[in-house]
């Protein structure tokens, strides 16, 4: 769910929910840095486990992932530019 979109930069604030076992393949965001704050659950990212209260950061253009929801996960994610994926 998009909570806010910046009119000038295209940056986004997104509330995301993942079902347990859901996987997002490795990817990069060429136009935006990504910050994901885990509100609930357990998320595995490139071999690192993130739990409620932890913050993940992926610099613009950096390949990261796969994302694996080890449990149901709710996160608040910020992209500081347009959300593009490669």
Regions found by a protein language model. Name each.
Residues 25-27, 86:
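A generic structural signal for short coil/turn motifs at secondary-structure boundaries
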Residues 23-25, 44, 56, 60-65:
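Histidine-centered metal-chelating micro-motifs
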Residues 15-18, 39-41, 75-77:
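Short, well-ordered beta-strand segments in beta-rich or mixed alpha/beta enzyme
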Residues 7-10, 47, 67:
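Short glycine/serine/proline-enriched coil/turn segments at secondary-structure junctions
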Residues 1-25:
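A short glycine-rich, His/Asp/Glu-containing loop-to-beta-strand
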């Amino acid at each position: 769910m998009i909570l806010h979109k910046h009119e000038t930069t295209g940056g986004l604030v997104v509330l995301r929910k993942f079902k347990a076992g859901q996987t997002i393949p490795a990817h990069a965001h060429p136009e935006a840095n990504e910050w994901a704050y885990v509100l609930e659950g357990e998320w595995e990212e490139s071999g690192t486990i993130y739990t409620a209260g932890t913050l993940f950061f992926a610099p613009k253009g950096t390949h990261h992932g796969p994302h694996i929801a080890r449990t149901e996960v709710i996160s608040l994610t910020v992209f500081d530019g347009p959300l593009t994926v490669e």
